[in-house]
């Protein structure tokens, strides 16, 4: 029986990141709405409780509160951002509007040598004060500590940036330790979960396989399952896991929607029919997809259309299988989060994912999502534990809508052909270039990264087609052709990301090759936007 951490979600877009950090400490956790009943909290029997952030304010008429049972259990509690504010209000403190809102990077001073922050610092001031580099996102602030609490941290704009009641094991921070921008955030959460809560670190993917297989068998019984196979990491691992559970009851449906990467169809069929010996049905539906996308420019509309057409194709294939009752998908946590689909339904929608946004209520198949509660690196760990080859497991993620969300505006076959060739060149250059000692000296990578390919050093890389033309010169002639943008990011969780600082020589080779080898493109740019404020995909 795993020790469990209960994460109460107040509607933050990054609540799942809290879960990711807890799981990185190999401790099992679950996310549930903040308004669960006292009985639920008691029956859950958590080793500790974490209160998430929120876009809401403690001043709103319908204030979000933690159940009273949280304070009656006698277990450690960690409040984050809004979670700190509701802890303060519920336990007798005071919260007020802040004249100096904080959104972004801040330097925070630790006070009092509490168990949570003791010995954790990024640098020390001349006066000897330990300082932390943190990420803030708040408009309200705690103005008065609740009884029994002591000051734990502060910033110039937020005098009470952290508070602690060590006797009861209550800790709260105004910053977000779950995001990668908080340098020591992972260490802080591990400290809370492992040392303060005393949870056992026994949550590992090799153990998860047995539980997941048993759950799939219980759900499916003797019914048949169809799965949309894209060749990406998520659908591949989902297919392997389901195949492990029910064997030939699974039929993989590979749909060529005309928006795949270069030579992807052949690679997918060779991989799954040849290596996994799974049943694969190949459906060429490119005319169907591209036809419905004609004239459509809105990103959400494109995603919904692609999702809808996937469902229609799957339904058509399901009718050919007498026992097909289930549609399996490789949906993972970030898909659900970016669709505003947390269990509370309070998160603000950023974009809909094809796996969750395009399914009509009248879908004739039941939905099987065995990876829904896992993050990307957990999915990769699961794939390795299932025996999948590294080239499959560590391939960069590819969106379900394919190149449809990497072509800005209207999708045309001409645009897709140009983009897939440009994308292939960029990926080829990343795979063929290794990091050097000079790259490390320039701060582009760490010393331990020397010798690794830049493909392995980036988490996701791709080209984007821009439907605008620019003037160029080739030979003695004037050109007027399209523009493509290269995008490469580094991230541990895909919830936040930094743009990859690639060597100029690599970018130069990729640009020169694209312009010379892809007729129709005469300008290449590089995207240096982080997430936030930008998303990883352009649409």
Curated annotation (Swiss-Prot):
GO cellular component: cytosol
Limits of the GMPS ATP-PPase domain: 203-395
One GO molecular-function entry: ATP binding
Cross-referenced Gene3D superfamilies: 3.30.300.10, 3.40.50.880, HUPs
Catalytic activity, EC: 6.3.5.2
Active-site residues from the entry: 81, 176, 178
Enzymatic class: ligase
Pathway the protein takes part in: Purine metabolism; GMP biosynthesis; GMP from XMP (L-Gln route): step 1/1
Keywords: ATP-binding, Glutamine amidotransferase, GMP biosynthesis, Ligase, Nucleotide-binding, Purine biosynthesis
Disulfide bridges in this chain: none
Reaction(s) catalysed (UniProt annotation): XMP + L-glutamine + ATP + H2O = GMP + L-glutamate + AMP + diphosphate + 2 H(+)
Cited CDD domains: GATase1_GMP_Synthase (cd01742), GMP_synthase_C (cd01997)
Glutamine amidotransferase type-1 domain span: 4-202
Function: Catalyzes the synthesis of GMP from XMP.
NCBIfam families reported in the protein's UniProt record: guaA_Cterm, guaA_Nterm, PRK00074.1
Protein name (Swiss-Prot/TrEMBL): GMP synthase [glutamine-hydrolyzing]
Lineage start: Bacteria, Pseudomonadati, Pseudomonadota, Betaproteobacteria, Burkholderiales
Gene that encodes the chain: guaA
């Amino acid at each position: 029986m795993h020790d469990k951490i209960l994460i109460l979600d107040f509607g933050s877009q990054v609540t799942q990141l809290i879960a990711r950090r807890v799981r990185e400490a190999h401790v099992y956790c679950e996310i549930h709405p903040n308004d669960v009943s006292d009985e639920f909290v008691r029956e859950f029997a958590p080793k500790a409780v974490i209160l998430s952030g929120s876009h809401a304010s403690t001043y709103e008429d319908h204030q979000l509160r933690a159940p009273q049972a949280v304070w009656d259990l006698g277990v450690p509690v960690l409040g984050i951002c809004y979670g700190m504010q509701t802890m303060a209000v519920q336990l007798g403190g005071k919260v007020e509007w802040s004249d100096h809102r904080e959104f972004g990077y801040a330097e925070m001073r630790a006070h009092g040598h509490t168990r949570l922050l003791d010995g954790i610092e990024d640098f020390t001031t001349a006066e000897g004060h330990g300082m932390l580099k943190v990420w803030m996102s708040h408009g309200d602030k705690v103005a008065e500590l609740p009884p029994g609490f002591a000051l734990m941290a502060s910033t110039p704009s937020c005098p009470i940036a952290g508070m602690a009641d060590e006797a009861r094991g209550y800790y709260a921070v105004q910053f977000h330790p779950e995001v990668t921008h908080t340098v020591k955030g992972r260490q802080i959460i591990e400290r809370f979960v492992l040392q303060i809560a005393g949870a056992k670190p026994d949550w590992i993917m090799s153990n998860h396989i047995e539980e997941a297989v048993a759950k799939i068998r219980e759900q499916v019984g003797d019914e048949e399952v169809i799965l949309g196979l894209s060749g990406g990491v998520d659908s591949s691992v989902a297919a392997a896991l389901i195949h492990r559970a029910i064997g030939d009851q699974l039929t993989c449906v590979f749909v060529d929607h005309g928006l795949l990467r270069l030579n992807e169809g052949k690679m997918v069929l060779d991989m799954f029919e040849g290596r996994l010996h799974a049943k694969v049905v190949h459906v060429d539906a490119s005319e169907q997809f591209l036809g419905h996308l004609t004239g459509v420019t809105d990103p959400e509309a494109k995603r919904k259309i692609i999702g809808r057409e996937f469902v229609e194709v799957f339904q058509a294939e399901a009718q050919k299988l007498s026992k097909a009752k289930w549609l399996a998908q490789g949906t993972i946590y970030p898909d659900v989060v970016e669709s505003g689909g947390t269990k509370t339904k309070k998160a603000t929608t950023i974009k809909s994912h094809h796996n969750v946004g395009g399914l009509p209520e009248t879908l004739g198949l039941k939905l099987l999502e065995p990876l829904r509660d896992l993050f990307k690196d957990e999915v990769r760990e699961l794939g390795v534990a299932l025996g999948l080859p590294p080239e499959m497991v560590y391939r960069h993620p590819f969106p379900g809508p394919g190149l449809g969300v990497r072509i800005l505006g209207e999708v045309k076959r001409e645009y897709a052909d140009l983009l897939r060739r440009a994308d292939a060149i960029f990926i080829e250059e990343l795979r063929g270039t290794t990091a050097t000692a000079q790259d490390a000296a320039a701060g582009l990578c760490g010393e331990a990264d020397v010798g690794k390919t830049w493909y392995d050093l980036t988490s996701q890389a791709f080209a984007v087609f821009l439907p605008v033309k620019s003037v160029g010169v080739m030979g003695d002639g004037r050109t007027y052709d399209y523009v493509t943008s290269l995008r490469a990011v580094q991230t541990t969780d895909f919830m936040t990301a930094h743009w990859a600082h690639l060597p100029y020589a690599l970018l130069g080779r990729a640009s020169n090759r694209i312009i010379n080898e892809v007729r129709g493109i005469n300008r290449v740019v590089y995207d240096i936007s982080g997430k936030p404020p930008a998303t990883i995909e352009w649409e």
